[in-house]
Amino acid sequence: MLAHRFCSALLISLALLLLPLGAAKAAADGIVRLKSAYGMQETIDRLKEDIAAKGIKFFSEIDQSKLAADAGIELAPSTLLIFGNPPLGTLFITADPDAGLDWPVRLLVFQDDKGQVWVAYTDFAWIAKRHGITNRDKEFTMATGVIGSITSVVTK
């Protein structure tokens, strides 16, 4: 129990320290889009390495362009990374079961028609508003800081 409290306190402290890194502005649609400084595979590798280094559970990597190719459809490179911290993410779901539509965290890595690689995710403040969750501000702030830290490994 003491170790759990220590880890929780450490994660909160880390998130608050890194909050300025996660201060990316969401578009009106609630999507944060950031340019990657790297190619597609290096972006994916760097993100996955940072997720693992932070001790965050990695659930899945879905190569959407491969799925499209298997269906005979051409799609620019697009990969969805799914990860999260169940003790944190489930707190959002306990506030509103519909929040399960937005958890675990999904981070999209895609290449546009000019060859620029992007990372995109749903803004956590937008998720809170979408689900009317008003009693988890500390947790949303922490999640924002963590995703900002993760994406900072591929942005300049």
Model regions: which residues?
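Bacterial N-terminal signal peptides that target proteins for export
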Residues: 1-11
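Beta-strand/loop substructures that line and gate deep hydrophobic ligand-binding cavities in soluble
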Residues: 106-133
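Bacterial N-terminal signal peptides
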Residues: 9-20
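C-terminal partner/receptor-binding element of secreted or periplasmic proteins
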Residues: 124-156
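Solvent-exposed, acidic/flexible segments
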Residues: 36-44, 61, 133-140
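Terminal, regulation- and interaction-focused segments at domain boundaries
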Residues: 26-56, 153-156
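Compact, glycine-rich, soluble single-domain proteins
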Residues: 52-105, 109
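Extracytoplasmic/secreted envelope proteins and their assembly/folding machinery
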Residues: 41-44, 48, 65, 144-148
